[in-house]
């Protein structure tokens, strides 16, 4: 579950690299059920979900690559989905960008005036999405006026000791607190801090063994302990309503 309930007070901006962000959102959705991957049209499955200290937000089923390794490394998982929130204004602008062809990633030829003031032109090739990135607000500059908070977590249903249980572990991060500490907004903070902790685990030899491994294949306890110490405290809810069948 990935909710950004913040407001950067821009008409349209992405919280990280626009090329990656827009391509990620406009690709087909993908989720896992009973050993099979199910593909959906982009953002076609959505429902309101309630996030701690935020309330209900429309949440959209998307493809996120961590699902692919989780179901491989935890073969007892029967179903896995990733949900992310988007505001209606963001989606309206995104539709406009797509309809105008500005989300294209193929090269187009453009007749551009020369910078020497001669009035002459030259044919150049540009990628529309890369051009769009150049004119959109820089994600690094959003933090100063960003308010609100993020809420990121996992909602899990299964059996423990023969009983049906639910479990919700989550972190909320306020954009202004992240900015005051690092000069960056909360989305960057919640991305960078876990990566830093992972590097720490590796450098200290806590997460180190021959071969190539995913994060979920290591002992989670020292990682979770560091999240609490490094500015991303987490909370647990046992046997609550997950709002998802």
Question: How would you name each of these model-derived features?
Answer:
Residues 1-245:
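C-terminal catalytic/substrate-binding lobe primarily of soluble NAD(P)-dependent oxidoreductases
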